[in-house]
């Protein structure tokens, strides 16, 4: 099987989940066929699986717009990146305060075609 370069891609920005949690789920479906990946993400019970599945479905829809056969598509790359970080203050004893970081993420899914 020869693999061509990236055919289609889709992305989502500023998702309320940390990159670390998204990377755990993205590792399940990297370099897998699209049909297998959608089933894996559907039955994974993590919130991150739902976020990645939405972006994957968007990439599949983009592939259909180009008239590509979905059975020959595989996930070439899933890129998880850092987005903005909200910083909050959590009051502690004796007048102290700790900082709490609320992290956001970006997802990019690139699909390739198996020839």
Swiss-Prot record:
Keywords: Ribonucleoprotein, Ribosomal protein, RNA-binding, rRNA-binding. The keyword Magnesium does not apply. GO terms for biological process: translation. InterPro entries: Ribosomal_uL22, Ribosomal_uL22_bac/chlpt-type, Ribosomal_uL22_bac/org-type, Ribosomal_uL22_sf. Pfam families: Ribosomal_L22. GO terms for molecular function: rRNA binding; structural constituent of ribosome. One of its GO terms (cellular component) is cytosolic large ribosomal subunit. Belongs to the universal ribosomal protein uL22 family. Part of the 50S ribosomal subunit. This protein binds specifically to 23S rRNA; its binding is stimulated by other ribosomal proteins, e.g. L4, L17, and L20. It is important during the early stages of 50S assembly. It makes multiple contacts with different domains of the 23S rRNA in the assembled 50S subunit and ribosome. This is Large ribosomal subunit protein uL22. The gene is rplV.
């Amino acid at each position: 099987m020869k693999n061509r370069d990236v055919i289609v891609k889709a992305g989502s920005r500023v998702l309320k989940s940390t990159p670390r949690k998204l990377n755990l789920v993205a590792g399940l479906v990297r370099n897998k066929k699209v049909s297998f990946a959608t089933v894996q993400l559907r039955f994974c019970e993590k919130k991150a699986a739902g976020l990645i599945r939405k972006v994957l479905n968007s990439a599949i829809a983009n592939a259909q717009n180009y008239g590509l056969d979905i059975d020959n598509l595989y996930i070439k790359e899933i890129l998880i990146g850092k987005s903005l970080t909200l910083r909050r203050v959590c009051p502690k004893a004796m007048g102290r305060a700790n900082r709490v970081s609320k992290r956001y993420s970006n997802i990019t899914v690139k699909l390739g075609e198996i020839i």
